[in-house]
Amino acid sequence: MEARRYGPNIIVTGTPGCGKSSTCEFLKNKLKDYKYYNISDFAKDNDCFEGYDEGRKSHIVDEDKLLDMLEPLLRQGNSIVDWHVNDVFPERLIDLVVVLRCDNSNLYSRLHARGYHDSKIEENLDAEIMGVVKQDAVESYEPHIVVELQSDTKEDMVSNVSRIVAWEKMWLEQHPDGVTNEYQGPRSDDEDDEDSE
């Protein structure tokens, strides 16, 4: 397995219908050497399901199997990950978490156009109002790598992609020797004392 990666891994997340896939389409056209993983498609293509939720009318992803298959790919870096769940991926492999937000009237229209049933629309609207995806991101990753961007219009998406591309350029400049994929563990008090000397 790769011990170091020389390009960042970026998660684009948010409530279903907030524009993740559209944003990722724009982004992968700008970051041409990046691999794009739509996790819903990846899970289906690699049979990473452990059941079906009749109430939600959706498959239940086997997160362990998903991670076993995806981690070697993320260790290579230069990945764009598109999924509404963001707390599955190891913190050591993620460099930026983009949480897309959407006005509820736009979100309702998008989900209704997709044919979501009313209870699923309501569940997603509630999640958006309460900022569930952002909260999960901040609890799962260092807060400084989590950024929240509005995603109501095509112009918003284009602007968001420009910001992500600028961040990627800065990341590459700051990490010319890449970053480790290995867990470094928490810093000890001894290390902090040595650093201050």
Swiss-Prot record:
Stretch list, region LID: 113-123
Keyword Nucleotide-binding among record annotations: yes
CC per GO annotation: cytoplasm; cytoplasmic stress granule; nucleus
The UniProt record lists the keyword Hydrolase: no
A single GO BP: cellular response to oxidative stress
Phosphoserine: residues bearing it: S188, S196
Region (Disordered): 176-197
Record's subunit section: Interacts with small ribosomal subunit protein uS11B/RPS14B. Not a structural component of 43S pre-ribosomes, but transiently interacts with them by binding to uS11/RPS14.
Additional detail: Present with 8350 molecules/cell in log phase SD medium.
Family in the record: Belongs to the adenylate kinase family. AK6 subfamily.
UniProt-recorded name of the protein: Adenylate kinase isoenzyme 6 homolog FAP7
Gene: FAP7
